[in-house]
Amino acid sequence: MTVDNLSAVNYPLSTIHCQPSTAMQPVKLYPSVFERIDQWPIYKLSQDRRRFIEEIDEFTLNRLVNEHPKLYNLITETIYLERIRLKESPWKVDPPNEMQFWNRLRAKIVKTESETKQQALETHKELILRIIHRYSTEIVGTFSIATFRFARLFLYNFFNRLLNAAAERWWRFLSSRNRLHERIQVYGEVEMIRDLMKKGIVIVVPTHFSNIDSILVGFAMDQIVGLPSFSYGAGLNLYNSGAAAFFMNRLGAYRVDRRKKNAIYLETLKTMSMLSIVRGTNTLFFPGGTRSRNGMVETRLKMGLLGTAVEAQRVLCEQNLAKENKKISESTRPEPTKIYIVPLVMSYHFVLEAPFLIRQHLQITGKEKYIAGRSEGNSIREWLKFIWQFFAKKSDIILSFGKPMDVMGNFVDENGDSFDARNNPLHISDYFTTEGGVTQDLQREEEYTKLLAERIVDRFHRENIVLSSHIVAFTAFNMLRANNDTFDLYALLRLLPDDFIFPIESFTAAIEAVQHALFELEEKKRLKLSDIIRLPAAQLLEDGVKNLGVYHVRKPLLFNKKGDIESDDFNTLFYYHNRLENFGLTKRVRWENYKMEMRIGEFKPETEII
């Protein structure tokens, strides 16, 4: 049954604004969980950096030796790939002696062909260890209290200055933190997360839409939620900038070089992540691996770093078992240090890089079917303009913290105890126990990682907070598709936006139908709605169009002089529409009931690059 059939019974159009509220309120401003920065796990790890690197080197070497019977092939393949990397994509941040290093290793590996089997094995181990150590010293960052305090003060004053300058009212200076809190709104299980910080290790896994995500998440967790700094990955290319390199080198970031695809580097990176978690370091990483190119909430996650959380939990279980000197009854046995996974969903009215990201996505998926049009700039000037306008205009940014889980995807309570779907208590160590002991089984842990990824994806969708801009973009693009149902996606995107009008009455009626569907999904706890979604459709439509892609030169949607809706850019409209894909909304509305108008009698797909 479609929404159109249900609306008259369940959600009368005249009372749609009276839908019960979920009573979501932004969290208050919290003090720091740990008053002293030298108590932070990331600082303690940095203080023991040399020993930490030694642990990485030793662990990675042992694993590679055990998993790769032919070390010669492993080394030669690594040298080959690294030499290609240096020739085809050199970066300013690369060490000046990089090519010399790999040339020397190539000369040494050739000499092993004349050595005895045992001599060659020892030489191979030595060479692999040298490679690992070069990688580990590059990857592992540091954390400086002085630099952190400077960065915190700088960001606070920077945002404060923008707020006052943009508002042109200096008397608001004293309330700037509260006004920033109004712009960056935080919802969810914050109290529980703060409690769990003192009981175990917290790993925050956010959705990823924009390059500004890292700054906003870090700022919100520090200034609003009061959490200590997390370890996080930063692309090595960012270190090409001297200023960026200075700060990231000293703020707990570990460096990730996405050019390096060889097995030794990837194993070293995963080992670093796993051992840092075992040492108690709270970590943040984007499980999707990169920004969402199509604008959808992630449905597929990268298993590499996510798997290190599962492995780290097993290692912690092993350590806990080793500390026990006698057998303890099942009812009284102590739990090991727990790892808690916290999904975090970012919700924006805008993504500065949206035109660039969707163009990349369409070029990859459409290939010859997709013809690129004009693009907006993504320069430093555009970024500065974006930051300025963000503070000059009220455009919400939402951070929704999900309910914490253990590494198996089971929910935990405020004490950190795990429970299954029937609310039965669980011991996390049971998942890693075979014949009475905690055992390593990498294949089993791969399956656990897949289960965890599925749970995170599910929570990403359930914790997603729908904004007014999401609903108007979703509605508009589905109207466009229904009114041009003979075209495939790429032909649809080649249509000239100037030829189409979304009549205000038809658009408003379609918005009402989508509202009905969203209320049903909210009732089933499939997603969350911002309070503005409960307003009458006309008000919701006005707010959504006003906020949608507010910083883009070519607007996804805008009002024309007659009060109807038009679009400057179907590609970007498609991007923002995708935010509500994968929720089953499309099939709940009879889109053919909502007609569009054309300015000309006949229109054809655009065939020239514009």
Describe every region a protein language model picked out.
Residues 2-7, 13-284, 289-610:
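Membrane-interfacial terminal anchoring regions of lipid-handling membrane enzymes
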